[in-house]
Every structure is written in structure tokens, then in C-alpha cells.
Amino acid sequence: MSIMRNFLSMIIMLCVCLNWCFAEGAEKSDSGKVLDSYTIQVSSLFPSSSSCVPSSKASNTKSSLRVVHMHGACSHLSSDARVDHDEIIRRDQARVESIYSKLSKNSANEVSEAKSTELPAKSGITLGSGNYIVTIGIGTPKHDLSLVFDTGSDLTWTQCEPCLGSCYSQKEPKFNPSSSSTYQNVSCSSPMCEDAESCSASNCVYSIVYGDKSFTQGFLAKEKFTLTNSDVLEDVYFGCGENNQGLFDGVAGLLGLGPGKLSLPAQTTTTYNNIFSYCLPSFTSNSTGHLTFGSAGISESVKFTPISSFPSAFNYGIDIIGISVGDKELAITPNSFSTEGAIIDSGTVFTRLPTKVYAELRSVFKEKMSSYKSTSGYGLFDTCYDFTGLDTVTYPTIAFSFAGSTVVELDGSGISLPIKISQVCLAFAGNDDLPAIFGNVQQTTLDVVYDVAGGRVGFAPNGC
């Protein structure tokens, strides 16, 4: 009898254990990941109407700024108007074309790209689709301004009063240097003026014409930048633009995070060791991300890949060595991405892949999604699905392998572009031009770390 009771007790314990294990498995399934696929709520693909929820990760370090998507629930620049996907795609393609144009010219000098101080007084096309913004205080007293941050640009600039040429419309009042006690124009004799090659009354004048015909022109200056109340930077070089054109959606200017000497990370090397990181929230979410300077708060789970010797002084290069869709590795050879490799860019929205690589990714994705109703393409995107009447959808995971044995699995929000419930598209595009570009949709929710001094870029999941 004693043996029987012990046996029954063991059976009961085993059942309890199995029940607990299955419950744990269900929890993991509910959280999104199931082996080689994600199951998500269809409603989560579309913008949330709930109020903004700030990310707690942005407040863990003093040198951290809140990042919002320009069209997201947390943006003070957004309106109730419907997101214009056609415009986003058009601007994104303009940015991509400007990147390839700069590469073909092999121009490493952003500031002197426009040699003349005579710029066309006409409406330029937007500076691409840089759609993530931060707010920084400039001057004394500080003037809070919303800036698009961009890893493909070096010089930080903002519109300034007076507008001697023309200025586009922005949400906040323009920065007025005469109202700041810490503003200083940079003299023509300054080493920082060497690249500008233009002067006005002994003051250094900068001119930047972007490849998409947007431009900014004004004085190269130094000013106090306030990141947070406890993190203030003195004598930061920036552009005080008095002649600016482009459709910048209400932002005051641009925060340059590129690899050049005038970028904010390069200027603050002694403070932050030329390290910065960010997490980009999906535009459909009601949460914020972060842009953090320095190594404080970087997760130990970050996996790094070397910054490649890509022949460009204005972008960060990375080497893609593999892509998987679900349980299938794409047949990528060492020559699939040519000698140019790839770049990672915070301002390009959608990832561009070599045409043959994209064709294989699309083929495998279609195979994994064969149980769903396909529909017509949209703009750049030729692989779309109709999810009408569905509560959930299961996507195959998509993972990128980078040099250094670094594997980055994309978040569910980094796979598709939801135009409407009857048209949800694979958010990748093929491109005959090189290099490949790893865009910001595919970077969403990842912690992306740029250790520029260490020559590496890192990734970790659940960054915001």
C-alpha cells in the first residue's frame, strides 16, 4: 500500500510539473515567439490610440534622451491625419538615391559639398525620411528644439533667426542666437572651418546640399547643449541655419551622429568615449525609445560586429554574411553583397537588399506564408497579404547574421508594413545599386550600440 501511495504521489507530481511546463510554453507563445515563427495580434500591426507610455530604459542613465517616432502616439509633432505611406516611401527612396549618389561621387566632405554661398531659393525635396526625433536644449537660457537624429550625417544644425534666405515651417519657435549668452560664431581661422571653405566678415559659413536637393546654409557656431538637466555640454560645434529648404515635418533641424569629426559623438569623445546607442520604437506603438550617449546602461547581452572598412566617410559599414527566414538559411555566397558590403542607417526606413538576395528572401517568406491570402503590391513592395477577419497572424522569424558570429533576430514590427488590414506588406525592397542598407524598420525595438572608438556596432533584443 505504501508503495502504491508513493507511486500515486509521483504521478500527481509529474502531472503538476507537466501542467506547469505547458503553461510556461503558452506564456512564451503569447509573448510572440514560437520556435521559428512569431504569432502576433493583427491589431498590433496598426497605430495604437492609447496614451503615450515613456520607456523606463531611457531614464536609467543621465545621458539619455527620449526618442519618439515622428508619426507615433508620443510625438508632439504628429497630427490626427492619416499617415501618408506614399509620401514616406517617396521620401525614403529619395534618401536612398542620395546615399548612392554620394557613394558614386565618393565625396567625404559633407560640410563643403556646396562650395558656393549662393543656393537655389526653391523648395527642396526632404532630407530623406529620418523619422525619429529627440529634443535637445540649445543655448543659455536653453531653447528646447526637436531634431531628427541621423547616423548618415555629421553636422548638427538648426534653423536660426533671422531667416535671411528662407526657412521651412517648424513646430517650435526658431533658435535666436542673439538671445543666448553662450553663442559664438566660429572664425575662419578655426581648424573646424577648414572644410567649409567660405567666410562672411571673418565668420565661418557652412553650406550643405543633400543629395535629395534639401539644403541648409548658415554660420558654423559653438553653443551650449543641454541633453538632460544634469548633462550639459559646452562649446558644441553646430550649424545655425539662416537659409534652409526641405520638407522636414515641423522639426527644427538635425542631430548628426555620423562618423565624421563634426558629429556630436566625435566632438564629445572625452566625455562619452565616442559611444552611443539607441532603441527605435515602432510607429504603431504607444511607447518611446531612447538615444543614449556613453557606455552606461549598455546591456551585457549586446553582441557586436565590426564596423567594416566600407569606402565611405559618412556612413557606418557592416558585413552581412547570412539571412534566415524561419528555419531556412538563404543561399548567400561571399559575393552576394559584393565588395561594398552594407551600411546601417537610422534615417533610411526600409532595408534594401541586392535584387537576388531579396528575391530569395521573398520566395522563402511566401512559402512560409502560403496559408494567408495574398493581395496586390504597394509601391516598392511586391509581397502583400490580406488579413481581413483574422485576429492573429504567424510570421516566420527573420534573422540577419553579421561578421563576428553576431545573429540578430528582427522584432515582429521589423518585418511588415501595414498599409491597411487588407494590405500588409513585407517591408524589404530589392535594389540593383550597392551597397545594401539596413534600415530603421528592421532595427525597431533593438538596442543598437555604436562603439565607434572600438570599431564595432552591437545589437540586443528588447531595447525599449
From Swiss-Prot:
InterPro entries listed in its UniProt record: Aspartic_peptidase_A1, PEPTIDASE_A1, Peptidase_aspartic_dom_sf, TAXi_C, TAXi_N
Gene3D superfamilies: Acid Proteases (2.40.70.10)
Keyword Disulfide bond part of the UniProt annotation: yes
GO cellular component, one term: apoplast
GO BP term, example: systemic acquired resistance
Cystine connections: C384-C425
Keyword Lyase on entry: no
Induction line: Up-regulated locally and systematically during systemic acquired resistance (SAR) and locally by salicylic acid. The local induction is independent of EDS1 while the systemic induction is EDS1-dependent.
Entry EC no(s): 3.4.23.-
Location of the protein in the cell: Secreted, Extracellular space, Apoplast
Entry-linked Pfam families: TAXi_C (PF14541), TAXi_N (PF14543)
Residues annotated as the enzyme's active site: D150, D345
GO molecular function: aspartic-type endopeptidase activity
Signal peptide start-end: 1-25
Keywords of this entry: Apoplast, Aspartyl protease, Disulfide bond, Hydrolase, Protease, Secreted, Signal
Root EC class: hydrolase
Entry similarity comment: Belongs to the peptidase A1 family.
Biological role stated in the UniProt entry: Aspartyl protease involved in a homeostatic feedback mechanism regulating systemic immunity. Has only mild or no influence on local defenses. Acts downstream of salicylic acid to suppress systemic immunity.
Protein name per the record: Aspartyl protease AED1
Name of the gene encoding the protein in the UniProt record: AED1
